[in-house]
Amino acid sequence: NDLIYVPEKMSDIRIVPAAGDKRSELAIWHDIYSFIKQDPYLRYHRGEYAERNGGRAPYVNQVDLNFAQDFFLETSSGQRNTIRVSLDISNFLNLLNKNWGVRQSTPSGWNQQYQFLQMTEKPSAANNYTPGFTMPEKNGAVPTSTFEDYISPSSRWAMQIGVKYMFN
């Protein structure tokens, strides 16, 4: 895969709308510019080639807690059995604040290898060997953010109460 050039101004990129795309070149540029502006890595590397693996997913913290209390019971035969009551909290940070401990991924429905630009015209002598690009629409919309919240059980807090009886 080739490294992507992050355009700084409209003249840095040749915009060619895809077949059936009713947006003007200027409207496509505004979509591209807005996308670049919202992403910290792309924003600070305008006018440069992006480094390999330069853009990374946001870091996520997750803290899991376990509380356990043992209660000892003497049986009539003199044995000491144990009842353990426990409380497990997965993703405790998300319990404290709904924005903490949330995993993020590229927008759903898009390729894991995220591409916000699509080549619409291959380099040739007719276009001075300069490829044409567009920002593709999906279901009538363009992506507006690099990452979105990954809605799954791993991004939400969970609590479990347990009772265990142990024979000795």
Report each predicted region and the residues it spans.
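Short, solvent-exposed micro-motifs at the edges of structured domains
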Residues: 1-168
